[in-house]
């Protein structure tokens, strides 16, 4: 038995969580688990336990939504076609608040999704093979930005509980109006897609339907190890770990059906 599995014996968590973690740990290491388990052993902090529960169901044992899997698979191609807007073009608009993609994103307008376009940046002359058709790429982008808009409109679901930045690339001008260097523009594309990926896949991932059901069962009827006596305390621990929970399912018309989890009503 490895050290990580032995560490489970000291964690006062629901039996089903401990069994799930044991199965995972027997197959591979889980990033951050050992440190959190050691921290709990050292100071008995409920924060460490809360983090273990959250990471178990939202990361270590969670399944990515299909569009997130495709995002990872086609990352480079999506970066090459990532939506952008020149600050210079905003200056020439009659009504920027309704015409500018940046302004629409800033106001979390649902109209922004229909205004987006995904042409390759004009000054990117490097030829790279495309694995997606234009239609497939458009659908993929729509789902990514539908997901992002959902979170941007609900900062209480985000990891930082703060508002998210605009997800498109904004290409500024120099103080005297000249274009910025192309190398800087390329870096803007790299940073922006990395930011959106981090928000959707790492910081605030959707909870799989299976894990939502598992957590609901635990909160409704905790199963305690022999050395844990308080069901109420364990229940509250799991409730706190579910903050920010939401689910995503495919919808035949809407693309994605994204909802705040029913677990939030139990907080």
Curated annotation (Swiss-Prot):
Keywords: Mitochondrion. It comes from the Eukaryota. One of its GO terms (cellular component) is mitochondrion. The keyword Mitochondrion applies. The keyword Nucleotide-binding does not apply. Its main location: mitochondrion. It is found in: Mitochondrion. Coiled coil: none annotated. InterPro entries: Gep5. GO terms for biological process: mitochondrial genome maintenance. Essential for respiratory growth and required for maintenance of mtDNA. Required for cell survival in the absence of prohibitins. Belongs to the GEP5 family. This is Genetic interactor of prohibitin 5, mitochondrial. It comes from Lachancea thermotolerans (strain ATCC 56472 / CBS 6340 / NRRL Y-8284).
């Amino acid at each position: 038995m490895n050290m990580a599995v032995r560490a489970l014996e000291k964690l006062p968590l629901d039996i089903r969580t401990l069994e799930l973690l044991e199965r995972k740990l027997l197959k591979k290491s889980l990033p951050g688990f050992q440190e959190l388990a050691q921290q709990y052993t050292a100071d008995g902090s409920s924060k460490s336990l809360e983090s273990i529960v959250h990471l178990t169901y939202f990361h270590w044992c969670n399944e990515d939504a299909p569009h997130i899997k495709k995002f990872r698979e086609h990352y480079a191609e999506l970066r090459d076609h990532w939506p952008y807007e020149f600050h210079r073009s905003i200056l020439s608009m009659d009504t920027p608040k309704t015409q500018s993609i940046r302004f629409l994103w800033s106001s979390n307008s649902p109209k922004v999704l229909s205004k987006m376009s995904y042409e390759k940046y004009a000054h990117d002359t490097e030829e790279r093979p495309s694995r997606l058709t234009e239609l497939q790429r458009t659908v993929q982008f729509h789902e990514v930005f539908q997901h992002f808009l959902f979170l941007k409109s609900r900062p209480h679901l985000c990891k930082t509980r703060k508002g998210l930045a605009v997800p498109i690339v904004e290409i500024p001008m120099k103080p005297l109006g000249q274009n910025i260097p192309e190398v800087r523009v390329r870096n803007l594309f790299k940073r922006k897609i990395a930011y959106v990926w981090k928000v959707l896949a790492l910081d605030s991932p959707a909870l799989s339907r299976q894990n939502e059901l598992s957590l609901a069962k635990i909160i409704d009827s905790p199963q305690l190890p022999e050395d844990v006596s308080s069901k109420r305390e364990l229940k509250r621990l799991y409730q706190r770990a579910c903050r920010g929970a939401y689910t995503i399912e495919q919808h035949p018309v809407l693309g994605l059906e994204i909802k705040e989890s029913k677990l939030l009503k139990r907080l």
